[in-house]
């Protein structure tokens, strides 16, 4: 932003703005220093969809299947650093499963 720091400028930023601060060393701003959060005005739901050929009907069944088949499942997202990508990586980390991330350049999320 090029506005003077007068307290009258409001910017709406998405999650990737905060995520990028952890992914990239050199940005033209410092997210922690330059931006002061005021309110969370939206929640971004995450939905997990699985191909019907995967024999899992619940999340625990999916986790068990993924652990039994490490690296054989793919996880798609709109792109590196997007909210679905980061939440997918968090899901992998929290469950101890191994899936291959497939980033698509289909849009921003």
Regions inferred by a protein language model and the residue ranges of each:
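Hinge/capping helix and adjacent helix->loop/strand transition within the periplasmic-binding protein
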Residues: 2-8, 22-106
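Beta->alpha turn/N-cap motifs
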Residues: 12-17, 107
